[in-house]
């Protein structure tokens, strides 16, 4: 593909409006050609030149559309991605990849058989704080990490009337937030030996998981992943302890908030996180504590990599094989919680 890659976006809810549409439009070599939506006015208010169609099938049947992006309710990921692949399109699916592991494996096999690129939007690989932490560990600054703790805590005590908080397949924060944390952990440390997971519905009227606490066990390391909707006080985003020192970071990557506020790309100061982490290093009897500059986040890198992959100039940034690993952990975690047991990976 030497001309612009024409993208069809399914739906125009929060994920499409906040993440996918502006990131696609801000990526040289990509063109948001059409959106399937029942609310043409909403789409046109943001992107007047973009065509709006009533049904996803119109995108699948359009020979000029190269790539289909699917940021729809989780239980629709599988049928929509399957239909798009069968229509010969390349596909990006928002996380979580699917609702079940078997669905994820079926899509991967279909993409391989059709020779299409299938990628999953695990955008938090490009969070400011995660990129900073990844660099710290790669450089060995903390030594051998023995304890890694990652929180995604919010204060939303009232259950809202939206699909993510209803009781359907793929709802709740084990499917919404945990995939981010699981993906980051695997990026840093690989797959664990075993998992111990607690899932709960703690808010009055909750119909889906609004609390999770997962312990991923490695031979010389424990990884704790935690999420709740009932944390009024600020929690540390990361707490990492190693043989040479520790790193603690508060606050969330700023990119989502800026995109939500309608900022457009590119911008020179994109991704800058004004909150430093705290690095504590110990050598002998000397203990040194310093603020550690947070690297800029880079969500635009995902779609730039998708462009390059479709043009044959680079690798798929998040191939289905990696997203399948997340689905394995999602399902194993649910079994662990159900049986109140520590379960080993197969």
PLM regions and their residue ranges:
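N-terminal Rossmann-like dinucleotide-binding module
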Residues: 1-47
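C-terminal helix-rich "cap/oligomerization" subdomain common to oxidoreductases
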Residues: 1-4, 67-69, 264-265, 291, ...
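Contiguous beta-strand/loop segments that form the cofactor/metal-binding neighborhood of enzyme cores
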Residues: 183-265, 300-314
């Amino acid at each position: 593909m030497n001309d612009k890659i024409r993208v069809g976006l399914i739906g125009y809810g929060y994920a499409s409006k906040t993440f996918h549409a502006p990131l696609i439009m801000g990526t040289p070599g990509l063109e948001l050609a059409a959106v399937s939506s029942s609310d043409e006015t909403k789409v046109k208010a943001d992107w007047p030149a973009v065509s709006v169609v009533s049904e996803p099938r119109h995108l699948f049947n359009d020979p000029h559309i190269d790539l289909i992006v699917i940021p729809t309710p989780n239980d629709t990921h599988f049928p929509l991605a399957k239909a798009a692949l069968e229509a010969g399109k390349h596909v990006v699916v928002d996380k979580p990849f699917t609702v079940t592991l078997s669905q994820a494996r079926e899509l991967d096999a279909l993409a391989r058989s059709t020779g299409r690129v299938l990628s999953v939007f695990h955008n938090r690989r490009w969070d400011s704080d995660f990129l900073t932490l990844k660099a710290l560990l790669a450089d060995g600054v903390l030594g051998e990490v023995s304890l890694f703790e990652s929180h995604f805590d919010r204060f939303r005590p009232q259950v809202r009337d939206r699909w993510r908080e209803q009781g359907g397949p793929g709802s709740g924060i084990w499917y919404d937030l945990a995939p981010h944390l699981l993906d980051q952990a695997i990026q840093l440390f690989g797959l664990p030996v075993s998992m111990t997971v607690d899932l709960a519905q703690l808010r009055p009227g909750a119909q889906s998981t609004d609390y999770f606490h997962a312990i991923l066990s490695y031979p010389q390391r424990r990884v704790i992943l935690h999420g709740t909707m009932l944390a009024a006080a600020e929690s540390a985003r990361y707490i990492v302890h190693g043989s040479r020192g520790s790193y603690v970071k508060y606050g969330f990557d700023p990119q989502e908030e800026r995109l939500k506020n309608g900022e457009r790309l590119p911008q020179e100061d994109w991704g800058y996180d004004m909150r430093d982490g705290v690095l504590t290093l110990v050598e002998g009897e000397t203990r040194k504590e310093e603020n550690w500059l947070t690297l800029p986040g880079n969500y635009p890198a995902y779609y730039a990599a998708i462009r390059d992959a479709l043009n044959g100039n680079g690798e798929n940034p998040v191939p289905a094989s990696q997203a399948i690993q997340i689905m394995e952990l999602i399902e194993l975690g649910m079994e662990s919680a159900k049986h109140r047991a520590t379960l080993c990976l197969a």
